From Swiss-Prot:
Pathway(s) annotated for this protein in UniProt: Porphyrin-containing compound metabolism; protoporphyrin-IX biosynthesis; coproporphyrinogen-III from 5-aminolevulinate: step 2/4
Record's keyword terms, sorted: Porphyrin biosynthesis, Transferase
Gene3D superfamilies: Periplasmic binding protein-like II (3.40.190.10), Porphobilinogen deaminase, C-terminal domain (3.30.160.40)
EC supergroup of this enzyme: transferase
UniProt protein name: Porphobilinogen deaminase
UniProt xrefs under InterPro entries: HemC, Porphobilin_deaminase_cofac_BS, Porphobilin_deaminase_N, Porphobilinogen_deaminase_C, Porphobilinogen_deaminase_C_sf
SUPFAM superfamilies referenced in this protein's UniProt entry, alphabetically: Periplasmic binding protein-like II (SSF53850), Porphobilinogen deaminase (hydroxymethylbilane synthase), C-terminal domain (SSF54782)
Species, as recorded: Bacillus cereus (strain AH820)
Cross-referenced Pfam families: Porphobil_deam, Porphobil_deamC
PTM-bearing positions, type S-(dipyrrolylmethanemethyl)cysteine: C241
Record's GO cellular component terms: cytoplasm
EC number: 2.5.1.61
Domain of life: Bacteria
Length: 309
């Protein structure tokens, strides 16, 4: 019986996601056993500055990918939105399980909705994507950076001078806290989700055919297709955590991919947005990127990167 070593970050959410996925594999009843290896990433250690300031790409995955390449582990369970657009040679996303709710969750101290927040209220987020889109809707708000895992951020909302914070609905759902803490879900038209938000990425070595066969049982074709379109768009624009960039795809009634893509200025005063429909994930992602480039996306990205230096 083969033992599969599964790499995971140490946070409660990461371990919850990893153990959930292992349970899906165990339910297949095939002759494998599993062991979780906890790995500390750079993103877990650097908590005193925003992700964009420390070069956001791959902050939560590099050490785990190193463990894959050196065969310390056989596969890793990541949040898809943490994955860089390009993976190291020899590694691949071997499986995308079914995506859960991709929306952002708005959590306010007083129970007020986003629209009801008092003028000048303090909004906590560590995401340039969220801050740009929410400042575009409410320029009167103040954004204050907030870092840490879910529990830490919820505690900071209670104890510090934040009026509200934004978290991914998916993480709260996986922890079983969504009904308890969420004031409202932000509609995708107000705040386009991050590329891959709500989805998991199961990363493994390209040459591990045995494991790839096992992972194929859990793969969700719809999630694979939609996330592929989003990631092609992200790759073409070379967007990471340093840029307000968003991309969310769904499957239409006619089985086409519909991708809404966005690039913004840091302060939300400019938001470029395009929706592209097509059948091929790569073509849809490239078309969305090309249309935004024509609108001036590259200039916004350049300005955002300069602002981070």
């Amino acid at each position: 019986m083969r033992k599969i070593i599964v790499g995971s970050r140490k946070s409660k959410l990461a371990l919850t996601q990893t153990n959930w996925f292992i349970d899906q594999l165990k339910a297949l009843g095939l002759p494998y056993e599993f062991e979780v290896k906890e790995i500390v990433t750079k993103g877990d250690v650097i908590l005193d500055v925003t992700l964009s300031k420390v070069g956001g790409k791959g902050l939560f995955v590099k050490e785990i990918e190193h463990a894959l390449l050196t065969k310390e582990i056989d596969m890793a369970v990541h949040s898809m939105k943490d994955m860089p657009a390009v993976l190291p040679e020899g590694l691949m996303i071997g499986c995308t399980p079914k995506r859960v709710d991709p929306r952002d969750a708005f959590i306010s101290k007083s129970g007020a909705s986003f629209k009801e927040l008092a003028e000048g209220a303090i909004l906590g987020t560590s995401s340039l994507r969220r801050s740009a889109q929410l400042l575009a809707a409410r320029p009167d708000l103040q954004v204050k950076w907030i870092r840490g895992n879910i529990d830490t951020r919820l505690r900071k909302l209670k104890e510090e001078d934040y009026d509200a914070i934004i978290l991914a609905t998916a993480g709260l759902q996986r922890m079983g806290w969504d009904n308890e803490v969420i004031t409202e879900h932000l509609d995708e038209t107000l705040c386009v989700p991050a590329v891959g938000q709500g989805a998991l990425a199961i990363e493994c070595r390209e040459d591990d055919k045995d494991l790839l066969q096992l992972l194929a049982h859990i793969n969700d074709a719809v999630t694979e297709k939609t996330v592929a379109a989003e990631r092609v768009f992200l790759h073409k624009l070379e967007g990471g955590c340093q840029v307000p960039i968003a991309g969310y795809a769904t499957i239409t009634e006619n089985d086409a991919i519909e991708l809404t893509a966005l690039v913004g200025s840091m302060d939300g005063s400019v938001l470029l947005k395009e929706t592209v429909v097509g059948t091929d994930p790569e073509k849809v992602g490239l078309e969305a990127a090309d249309r935004l480039i024509k609108q001036g996306a590259k200039e916004l990205i350049l300005a955002a990167n300069k602002g981070q230096q």
